[in-house]
Amino acid sequence: MATPSDSSPTAPPGGGAVAPGQLIGERYRLEQCLSSDPQAPQGRLWRAADTLAGGAPAALRQLGPAVDPEAAGRRWAKLQGLLHPQVPRFGAAIAEGSDLWLVREWQDGRTYRELLEARAARQLVFGGGEVLLMLRQLLPVLVVLHGQDLVHGDLCPANLLRRERDGLPVLLD
């Protein structure tokens, strides 16, 4: 999610050598790299365990040295102020080595891309009613974002998660 006035170029991904088991910010133990494309411009996404919260899961985004840390920090601070039940809470921004790590609340569920692929494998699609319901559930989230002068910039099935506990769409990345 970015501000409309954010004109920084797409930054290369995080490049620091890290591996599962590594501790980030003396708190988050990396468990699994979830990025399907490690060269993605938004960096690498990791599932981690918060060692100060009994191993609770967290999502960490690893941004490399090509990212402007001041601009990313300003954007992250704005996101930390966002409070909506369909937007994961945004935690710390951790500078470690040449990388910037952005922490957010973990959400259990499947992305709409995964749901589409699973249905396509069975030669099924989402019905019109399902799509309309999802859009009605998502529009209030976008209203909150836009009210804070934030835009998502990449609203697609891969960035929408159907939350396991209540079935609501959750806006990611």
Predicted regions and their residues:
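Conserved N-lobe loop of protein kinases adjacent to the ATP-binding glycine-rich P-loop
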Residues: 49-56
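AlphaC helix of the eukaryotic protein kinase fold
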Residues: 66-81
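Flexible N-lobe loop architecture of eukaryotic-like protein kinase catalytic domains
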Residues: 83-87
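Activation-segment/catalytic-loop signature of the eukaryotic protein kinase fold
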Residues: 93
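Conserved short submotifs of the Hanks-type protein kinase catalytic core
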Residues: 97-111
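AlphaC helix of the protein kinase catalytic domain
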Residues: 112-125
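Activation segment signature within eukaryotic-like protein kinase domains
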Residues: 134-135
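Catalytic-loop of the protein kinase fold
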Residues: 142, 146-163
